């Protein structure tokens, strides 16, 4: 801890009195955690942290610091060029104020701006789309996706619409000024450098999204009921609007969760990957006799599908949706070039079996959609895009942008659901009988272990070291054929017999240790039980 920084913080006019009161009551351990000379650094998906006073948290001063580093980075990269940057925020608390702080810093560096009016909450995928459409050089969005309400973030993009890669992230951090330079900084907004986007960008985006669709007839009215929750986020109004343009007329809003609320007051978790996020949606579905539920997270990049199946509810994972998308697109779309998929190393490998039939290829990348976007940028024109996805309910179904896109994912998922209805088959049976029956029965899952200790990264690294040094030849009933560190994937691999594997990594956005399962077998129930047995063995090994 630097005592001079703390003193400076307490005397600065840029620090509100409420924050000064909080600092004054901090214990030494809390001050050590909150204050240091080191700037914040980028994780899997930008910079995310708690909103609080201190150099290691998010506040006006650290946003000044981050925005200055990014602005200098852009000026270095695009020297002697006009630079346009898009700035926006999602629905999180303080998002408006922080986006204004970012804008004020960047305009002080004389960068031209394109940004949405404050009243319009920006959909993250539209952000990526707008960069490409408007030929901008970069973008900043104030968001922490589905993180807890106490958090916010700083996510930056390059001129292709993809999130910046680690090397560029390091350059931005290196260009961030010392926090002493930011504490008493005074900046003013220069409106002459700001252009505000209007509704045209949404209409253009909706039109271009249709290229992700194959059989959807927008003039055909789809009468089945769809329950929708926006988890208090940016898609609460826009996604139903978009789906109605595609002919889905009977959309039932989960009213309590379709209002903008940075506190996420009416949901136990805003992450549709978690089962608890679905409880209220199920109540709505049961009340309205609906058989399908769709959800997106607050910044509308994650999409998830739930369907009624044999008097219960099934929620499809990112892996399952990736498999369904892959099979459907390859079967129903005409490809004039070699088809390709981009997916992470920790995502299912059943797609490799499917695309092999079509003489295509799967490109594997590290965890984080920035790697998916980057790989798409590098693929030659002699190949044709199928889908990009991760196991964490995130997909991209066309190349109009370079980030996960819940709008495209929802539209294609509902098209497939509608086609299954026409063929009198539940989408779950389609997956487990038609697809698994042809390509192999597989159990994919992700188990997360959450750490509450401040030194959680050190604890996770110790766990990963045990994984690498594991000396047994089996796990569960599986033979371990090799154990290695996957440098590109950023994970530790246990390669098992029968085309199966386990992978382990530290989360880049939350204090979690993650285990990824990819197990083939003869029976789904047996595979599920086997995964539980393996999970118990791993917990014992790591003392979790």
From Swiss-Prot:
One example GO MF annotation: magnesium ion binding
Enzyme class: isomerase
Keyword annotations: Isomerase, Magnesium, Metal-binding, Phosphoprotein
Keyword Metal-binding: yes
InterPro entries xref list: A-D-PHexomutase_a/b/a-I (IPR005844), A-D-PHexomutase_a/b/a-I/II/III (IPR016055), A-D-PHexomutase_a/b/a-II (IPR005845), A-D-PHexomutase_a/b/a-III (IPR005846), A-D-PHexomutase_C_sf (IPR036900), A-D-PHexomutase_CS (IPR016066)
Cofactor entry: Mg(2+)
Cofactor binding remark: Binds 1 Mg(2+) ion per subunit.
Binding site for Mg(2+): 145, 297, 299, 301
Single GO biological process annotation from the record: purine ribonucleoside salvage
Keyword Magnesium part of the UniProt annotation: yes
Residues of the active site: 145
Domain of life of the native organism: Bacteria
Pfam families referenced in this protein's UniProt entry, alphabetically: PGM_PMM_I, PGM_PMM_II, PGM_PMM_III
SUPFAM superfamilies hit by this protein: Phosphoglucomutase, C-terminal domain (SSF55957), Phosphoglucomutase, first 3 domains (SSF53738)
Family as reported in the entry's similarity comment: Belongs to the phosphohexose mutase family.
Protein name: Phosphomannomutase
Organism: Mycoplasmoides pirum (Mycoplasma pirum)
Upper taxonomic lineage: Bacteria, Bacillati, Mycoplasmatota, Mycoplasmoidales, Mycoplasmoidaceae
């Amino acid at each position: 801890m630097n005592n001079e920084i703390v003193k400076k913080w307490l005397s600065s006019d840029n620090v509100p009195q409420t924050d000064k009161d909080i600092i004054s009551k901090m214990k030494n351990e809390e001050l050590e955690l909150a204050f240091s000379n080191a700037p914040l650094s980028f994780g899997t998906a930008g910079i995310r942290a708690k909103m609080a006073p201190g150099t290691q948290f998010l506040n006006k001063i650290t946003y000044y610091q981050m925005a200055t580093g990014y602005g200098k980075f852009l000026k270095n990269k695009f020297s002697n060029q006009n630079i346009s940057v898009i700035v926006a925020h999602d629905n999180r608390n303080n998002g408006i104020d922080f986006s204004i702080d970012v804008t004020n810093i960047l305009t002080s560096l004389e960068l031209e701006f394109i940004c949405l009016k404050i009243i319009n909450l920006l959909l993250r995928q539209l952000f990526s789309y707008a960069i490409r459409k408007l030929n901008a050089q970069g973008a900043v969005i104030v968001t922490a996706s589905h993180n807890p309400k106490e958090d916010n973030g700083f996510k930056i993009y390059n001129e292709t619409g993809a999130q910046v890669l680690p090397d560029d992230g390091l350059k931005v951090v290196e260009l961030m000024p010392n926090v002493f330079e930011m504490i008493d900084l005074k900046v003013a907004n220069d409106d002459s450098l700001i252009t505000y986007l209007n509704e045209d960008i949404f209409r253009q985006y909706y039109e271009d999204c249709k290229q992700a669709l194959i059989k959807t007839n927008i003039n055909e009215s789809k009468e089945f009921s769809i329950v929708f929750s926006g988890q208090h986020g940016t898609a609460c109004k826009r996604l139903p609007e978009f789906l109605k343009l595609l002919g889905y007329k009977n959309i039932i809003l989960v009213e309590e969760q379709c209002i903008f609320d940075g506190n996420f007051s009416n949901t136990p978790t805003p992450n549709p990957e978690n089962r608890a996020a679905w409880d209220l949606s199920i109540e709505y579905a049961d009340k309205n006799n609906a058989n399908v539920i769709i959800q997106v997270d607050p910044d509308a990049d994650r999409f998830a599908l739930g369907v009624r199946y044999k008097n219960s509810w099934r929620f499809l994972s990112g892996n399952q949706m990736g498999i369904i998308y892959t099979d459907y697109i390859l079967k129903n779309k005409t490809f004039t070039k070699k088809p390709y998929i981009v997916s992470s190393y920790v995502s299912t490998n059943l797609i490799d079996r499917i695309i092999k039939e079509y003489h295509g290829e799967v490109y594997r990348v590290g965890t984080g959609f920035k790697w998916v976007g980057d790989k798409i940028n590098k693929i030659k024109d002699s190949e044709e895009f199928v889908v990009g996805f991760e196991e964490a309910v995130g997909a991209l179904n066309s190349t109009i942008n370079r980030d996960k896109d819940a709008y495209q994912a929802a539209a294609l998922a509902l098209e497939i659901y509608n086609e299954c209805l026409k063929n009198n088959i539940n989408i779950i049976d389609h997956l487990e009988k038609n697809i698994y029956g042809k390509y192999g029965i597989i159990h994919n899952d992700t188990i997360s272990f959450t750490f509450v200790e401040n030194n959680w990264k050190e604890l996770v690294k110790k766990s990963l070291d045990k994984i690498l040094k594991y000396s047994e030849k089996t796990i569960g009933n599986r033979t371990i054929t090799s154990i290695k560190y996957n440098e590109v994937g950023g994970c530790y691999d246990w390669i098992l017999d029968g085309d199966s594997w386990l992978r382990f990594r530290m989360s880049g956005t939350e204090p979690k240790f993650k285990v990824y399962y990819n197990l083939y077998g003869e029976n789904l129930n047996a595979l599920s039980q086997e995964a539980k047995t393996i999970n118990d063995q791993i917990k014992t090994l790591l003392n979790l």
